[in-house]
């Protein structure tokens, strides 16, 4: 009888400044969108867990909010959420952009990584956007910052070197159980992912002052008939002046947000969806603990 192959499992944190491609890498690894992507800072607000499973390995990736200097209770929640993962994982991926020089934000994170005992990998993203000589300059800027386990230049968007990174991480994980079923790619409920897909479209389509003031609450999900799933959601904003931006002339912007979000939600659920969106003004919600909790930002969950 052939000896059964040992199963390896563990947890990997993805950490870095806002907009370095953490969510793009997570989605690439699991093969489906579980974390929203945008060129706006602070896109990810919760720790998103993506699950990568093969015949002999299960890696649970935690995509943290981008670390930045907080300016509100929500910002404080995001940074605490990111830093709280570091002592609980088997490996840490510190992601940077190949097309950006090392700055104060990177040094802020590096200082906090100095106390981490787990192996830390420097992952240099967006190598498809720079000349190889520039990549060497970036590597030189970081080479002595921390005792890196390894340095991996990748393109999360194109997939360059991502498989090689996964192979290396597999060797880092201890023998352990399979925590989740093989076909499960995230531990977040569908409601959360649907709300994030809607928020992603708000981030993509609205002007700079709106995205940071936006939350999305799923009011109901139910099968309306044999053909469609009926989703009702409310887009929360902070100021009345933002309501007109979200709705648009004659409702054009809200319709566009709904149309693009519905497409992604249908892909997620594998079914036809009727999406009904509302817009509500809730002043200063980012600094109100009761509202943060009701919108899904609970510090005690982290």
Curated annotation (Swiss-Prot):
<feature type="region of interest" description="G4">
    <location>
        <begin position="125"/>
        <end position="128"/>
    </location>
</feature>
<dbReference type="InterPro" id="IPR009019">
    <property type="entry name" value="KH_sf_prok-type"/>
</dbReference>
<comment type="subunit">
    <text>Monomer.</text>
</comment>
<keyword id="KW-0342">GTP-binding</keyword>
<dbReference type="InterPro" id="IPR005225">
    <property type="entry name" value="Small_GTP-bd"/>
</dbReference>
<feature type="region of interest" description="G1">
    <location>
        <begin position="16"/>
        <end position="23"/>
    </location>
</feature>
<dbReference type="GO" id="GO:0043024">
    <property type="term" value="F:ribosomal small subunit binding"/>
</dbReference>
<dbReference type="InterPro" id="IPR030388">
    <property type="entry name" value="G_ERA_dom"/>
</dbReference>
<feature type="binding site">
    <location>
        <begin position="16"/>
        <end position="23"/>
    </location>
    <ligand>
        <name>GTP</name>
    </ligand>
</feature>
<comment type="similarity">
    <text>Belongs to the TRAFAC class TrmE-Era-EngA-EngB-Septin-like GTPase superfamily. Era GTPase family.</text>
</comment>
<dbReference type="GO" id="GO:0005829">
    <property type="term" value="C:cytosol"/>
</dbReference>
<dbReference type="InterPro" id="IPR027417">
    <property type="entry name" value="P-loop_NTPase"/>
</dbReference>
<dbReference type="Pfam" id="PF07650">
    <property type="entry name" value="KH_2"/>
</dbReference>
<feature type="region of interest" description="G2">
    <location>
        <begin position="42"/>
        <end position="46"/>
    </location>
</feature>
<dbReference type="GO" id="GO:0003924">
    <property type="term" value="F:GTPase activity"/>
</dbReference>
<feature type="domain" description="KH type-2">
    <location>
        <begin position="206"/>
        <end position="283"/>
    </location>
</feature>
<keyword id="KW-0699">rRNA-binding</keyword>
<dbReference type="Pfam" id="PF01926">
    <property type="entry name" value="MMR_HSR1"/>
</dbReference>
<keyword id="KW-0694">RNA-binding</keyword>
<dbReference type="InterPro" id="IPR004044">
    <property type="entry name" value="KH_dom_type_2"/>
</dbReference>
<dbReference type="GO" id="GO:0070181">
    <property type="term" value="F:small ribosomal subunit rRNA binding"/>
</dbReference>
<comment type="function">
    <text>An essential GTPase that binds both GDP and GTP, with rapid nucleotide exchange. Plays a role in 16S rRNA processing and 30S ribosomal subunit biogenesis and possibly also in cell cycle regulation and energy metabolism.</text>
</comment>
<feature type="binding site">
    <location>
        <begin position="63"/>
        <end position="67"/>
    </location>
    <ligand>
        <name>GTP</name>
    </ligand>
</feature>
<keyword id="KW-0472">Membrane</keyword>
<feature type="domain" description="Era-type G">
    <location>
        <begin position="8"/>
        <end position="175"/>
    </location>
</feature>
<feature type="region of interest" description="G5">
    <location>
        <begin position="154"/>
        <end position="156"/>
    </location>
</feature>
<feature type="region of interest" description="G3">
    <location>
        <begin position="63"/>
        <end position="66"/>
    </location>
</feature>
<dbReference type="InterPro" id="IPR015946">
    <property type="entry name" value="KH_dom-like_a/b"/>
</dbReference>
<dbReference type="GO" id="GO:0005886">
    <property type="term" value="C:plasma membrane"/>
</dbReference>
<dbReference type="GO" id="GO:0000028">
    <property type="term" value="P:ribosomal small subunit assembly"/>
</dbReference>
<keyword id="KW-0963">Cytoplasm</keyword>
<dbReference type="InterPro" id="IPR006073">
    <property type="entry name" value="GTP-bd"/>
</dbReference>
<keyword id="KW-0547">Nucleotide-binding</keyword>
<protein>
    <recommendedName>
        <fullName>GTPase Era</fullName>
    </recommendedName>
</protein>
<dbReference type="GO" id="GO:0005525">
    <property type="term" value="F:GTP binding"/>
</dbReference>
<dbReference type="InterPro" id="IPR005662">
    <property type="entry name" value="GTPase_Era-like"/>
</dbReference>
<keyword id="KW-1003">Cell membrane</keyword>
<keyword id="KW-0690">Ribosome biogenesis</keyword>
<feature type="binding site">
    <location>
        <begin position="125"/>
        <end position="128"/>
    </location>
    <ligand>
        <name>GTP</name>
    </ligand>
</feature>
């Amino acid at each position: 009888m052939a000896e059964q192959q040992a199963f390896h499992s563990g947890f990997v944190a993805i950490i870095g400044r806002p907009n370095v491609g953490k969510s793009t890498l997570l989605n690439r690894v699991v093969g489906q969108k579980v974390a929203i992507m945008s060129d706006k800072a602070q896109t990810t607000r919760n720790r998103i867990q993506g699950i990568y499973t093969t015949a002999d390995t299960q890696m649970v990736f935690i995509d943290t909010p981008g670390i930045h200097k907080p300016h509100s209770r929500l910002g404080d929640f995001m940074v605490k959420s990111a830093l709280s993962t570091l002592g609980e994982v088997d490996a840490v991926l510190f992601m940077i952009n190949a097309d950006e020089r090392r700055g104060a934000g990177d040094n802020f994170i590096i200082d906090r990584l100095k106390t981490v005992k787990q192996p830390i990998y420097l992952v240099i993203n967006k190598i498809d956007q720079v000349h190889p000589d520039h990549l060497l300059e970036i590597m030189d800027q970081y080479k002595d910052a921390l005792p890196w386990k390894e340095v991996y230049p990748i393109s999360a968007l194109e997939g360059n070197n991502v498989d090689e990174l996964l192979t290396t991480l597999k060797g880092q994980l201890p023998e352990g159980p399979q925590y989740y079923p093989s076909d499960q790619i995230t531990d977040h409920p569908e409601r959360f992912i649907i709300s994030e897909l809607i928020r992603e479209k708000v981030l993509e389509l609205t002007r700079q002052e709106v995205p940071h003031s936006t939350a999305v609450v799923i009011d109901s999900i139910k099968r309306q008939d044999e053909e469609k799933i009926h989703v009702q959601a409310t887009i929360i904003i902070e100021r009345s002046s933002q309501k007109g931006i979200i709705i648009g002339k004659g409702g054009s912007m809200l319709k566009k947000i709904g149309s693009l979000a519905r497409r992604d939600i249908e892909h997620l659920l594998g079914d036809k969806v009727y999406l009904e969106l509302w817009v509500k003004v809730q002043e200063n919600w980012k600094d109100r603990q009761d509202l943060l909790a009701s919108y899904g930002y609970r510090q005690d969950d982290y």
